[in-house]
Amino acid sequence: MTHTCVLTWLAEKYTMYLNMRKGVGFMEAISREDALALLKKYNKDPFHLQHAFTVEAVMKWFAKEMGYGDDADYWGIVGLLHDIDFELYPTEHCVKAPELLREGGVGEDIIHAVVSHGYGITIGNGTTLDTKPEHTMEKVLFAVDELTGLIGAAALMRPSKSTKDMELKSLKKKYKSKGFAAGCSREVIERGAEQLGWELDKLLTLTLQAMAATEDELRREIEN
């Protein structure tokens, strides 16, 4: 890490420590088992559940990759719950989520992270979401949410149906095709890379690596 990255990492760790002292931190709020039960309370569609599991696994991978390994489960919980309101309340996405999460005993830090992944997006009821990603974890969530969907769709087009043998050039070709996985916003993905201070290629490369590395784990989760 550079000196600036180290200072940022220390500041974020200290903020999370203070939050936990206040009783709003993840470890005091909800377990993975309870988070999964809460997710399934509001989500039944296998596609939505698979997306939640995918983002959970990718978030945990990024936590470890970026030096936040001790917080990998925390990052994963955020990924698991990020779309909790989408299935039942699609026109209130990220607006209804705080209510559902608070009822489930989820801490305000996770709620902020979940809501922030919709930053700048105008949802079905005409509201433009204005909760900005602040923590590195929140910026990663914003960046990978749409991208995991695009990579997953690209994998399904391959004979192997896998990300493990997918090369970056193949992904970039699909990415540049506006008609492919059109529902996965390239604008949001590119804003996500910008918020992280990364080139788009870096985000594509790392997210592809994350999905390939966690593919077997994800398959086991879906089969359970």
Label the model's feature ranges.
Residues 25-89:
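Acidic/His-rich, divalent-metal-binding segments that scaffold phosphate/diphosphate chemistry
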Residues 19, 26-32, 196-224:
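N-terminal charge/polar-biased segments
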Residues 68-180:
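Divalent metal-dependent catalytic cores for phosphoryl transfer on phosphate-bearing substrates
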Residues 163-205:
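Divalent-cation-assisted or electrostatically stabilized phosphate/pyrophosphate-binding catalytic cores
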Residues 58-65, 72, 187, 199-214:
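Active-site hotspot residues in diverse enzymes, especially metal/ion-binding acidic/histidine motifs
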